[in-house]
């Protein structure tokens, strides 16, 4: 499959079809179009890629990368998603020009599902699955992290909900 974007109704290919590729998030900053996704270069696992005005930059090796969020300001990017770690765990991550930060340490299966940035704070949402091997009970939960630290969410039942997306709004409390 060819990774492409549409601008004013016209498709613009990001790849030539020699690989399997996809775009999962787009963002415009300073007139520059950013598209984040993944590409299977050699038929193995997905490799994370950021296209800047159509030019690719790879931000992971072939580690089963899935992108679910992109934020760009003044040319600096934050990409959110998940990848398969060396241990085989699926972990939620953010990638910047400085490298990768694993957000979901200690969780065997946690998919990133949303990214929001408010000022200098980075919020990431995810869906996690685990197993209580004593009772063989499946455990599902949806953590939200602020700057890499998991936040407590007020919910009626913490074992029966998922988070697919995240948004931040500023509320001016000063009059």
Regions found by a protein language model. Name each.
Residues 1-175:
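Residue-level hotspots at or immediately adjacent to binding/recognition sites across diverse folds
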């Amino acid at each position: 499959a060819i990774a492409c974007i549409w601008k004013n109704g016209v498709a613009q290919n990001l790849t030539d079809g020699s690989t399997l590729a996809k775009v999962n998030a787009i963002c415009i900053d300073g007139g520059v179009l950013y598209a984040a996704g993944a590409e299977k270069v050699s038929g193995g696992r997905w490799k994370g890629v950021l296209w800047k005005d159509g030019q690719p930059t790879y931000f992971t090796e072939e580690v089963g990368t899935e992108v679910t969020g992109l934020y760009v300001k003044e040319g600096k990017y934050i990409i959110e998603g998940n990848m398969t770690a060396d241990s085989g765990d699926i972990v939620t991550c953010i990638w910047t020009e400085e490298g990768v930060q694993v957000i979901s340490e200690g969780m065997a299966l946690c998919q990133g599902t949303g990214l929001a940035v408010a000022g200098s704070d980075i919020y990431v949402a995810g869906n996690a699955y685990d197993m209580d091997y004593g009772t063989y009970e499946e455990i599902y939960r949806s953590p939200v992290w602020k700057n890499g630290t998991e936040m407590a969410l007020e919910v009626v039942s913490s074992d029966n909900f998922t988070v697919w997306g995240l948004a931040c709004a500023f509320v001016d409390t000063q009059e």
